[in-house]
Amino acid sequence: MSKGLVLTGGGARAAYQVGVLKGIARILPRSVYNPFPIICGTSAGAINALSIAGRAGPFRLRTSKLERIWNELTPADVYRTDPRGVLKNTFHVLASFVHSGYGIGKPISLLDNSPLRKMMDNYVKFDYLDTAISNGELEAIAVTAMSYASGQSVTFYQGNETIAPWNRSRRRGEKIELSIDHLMASTAIPGLFPAVQIDRDYFGDGAVRQLKPISPALHMGANKLLIIGVSDNAGRSPRVNGMEHSPSTAQIVGHMFNSAFIDAVESDLETLHNINRLASALPQSLREKNNITDLNPIDVLAISPTESIDSIAQEHLHELPRSLRLFLSLTGATAQGGGSSAASYLLFEPGFCRKLIDMGMRDALAKEADIKEFFEL
C-alpha cells in the first residue's frame, strides 16, 4: 500500500509539523530512508514537504536537519524586517491604487520574502527529486498553488510515469519538474507575500481555493494517509463568552487565514471519514452492480495540536521585529487586543517555533501505537 504524507499550510505554525515528523522518525527504525512514497505540501507545508523529499539520507537525519532550520529561524530569514523595506513595500501597495491596483515592475505585497527564496533554494536539492523517483524511494512529490488567472487550485507534481495529470472542478494536477518557483508560489500568502510568475500565469498561496487538500495524494495513488494539520481545535467547538468590543482588523484577518489554512482540511477529513463508512458498509456485490469497485476505504491517521497555538503565539508577540510589531499593533494584533491568531502565521521566531516543535514531538509520541499500526510495525 502506498503511504502518503499530507502537510497543510499555516505559516510559522508549520513548525508543529516538524515536531510530529521528528516523533515519527524516533518511532520508526533508524534504517528507514523515506517512509512516505507520496508527499504533498501546501503553503508552509510545501517547505517541509520539499525539505524532506529533496534531501538524501535516512529519515531521522532529514527530520533532524529540518528541525535545525526551524530552531534557528528568524523573521529576517523569511522576509525583510528592516523599517525601510517594510515602508517601501507599504508605499508600493498604496501607490498601486493610482494604477488601478496593479503593481508596477513587480507584484505588490506588504512583505518581501526574498530571504526565504534564497534559503530554500540553497537547502532543497531539487535535482535529487528525480534521483529519488528513479531509484523507487519516492513515487511523487507535489506542491499546490492558486492560479490568479483561473482561480484554480493547481497541484504541481513530479512523479513516476504511472501518475497521470488530472482535471476536476476548480482543481487540476500538472506534471512538471519542480523548482524554487513552485515552492515560493505555494507559500505566497495573498497581500503579504508577492505572487510568483510561472510560465504566463501568476500564482499565490496554495491553501487559498484548495477545497480538497487531501485529493492530490489520492490522485497520485496513496491509499494510506498521514495528515499533519495545524489547527488547535480540530474536532472541538469551544464555547466562548462573547466579546466586549467589535473585532479588530487582526482578528478578522486571523479568521480569514484560519478559513484558508485550516477549515478546508478539517472539512475534507470529515468527508473522507463519511466515504470510508459508506465504502465499508457496501458489500462487494453491490459495488460491482453499481460499477464502483474502486470505492475502497482509505486508512487515515490525522495528527493536530493538542494545545492552543494562538495562546502560545500570544506569549511571543514581543519577539517580532519592531517594524512588524508596530504594523501589527495598528491592526489590533496585540496580546491585549487579540488577533494573535493572525500574528502566529508570521511568528518565525526561535522561541515560538521551538515550542511548536516540542508540542508536535509530544503529540506524535502520544500516538505511538497508532503510528506503529499505520506503518504496520
Which positions does each model-derived feature cover?
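Alpha-helical membrane-targeting segments
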Residues: 79-111, 115, 245, 252-264, ...
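C-terminal amphipathic alpha-helical segment
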Residues: 252-291
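C-terminal helical/tail subdomains of lipid-metabolizing enzymes
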Residues: 107, 115, 120, 280-377
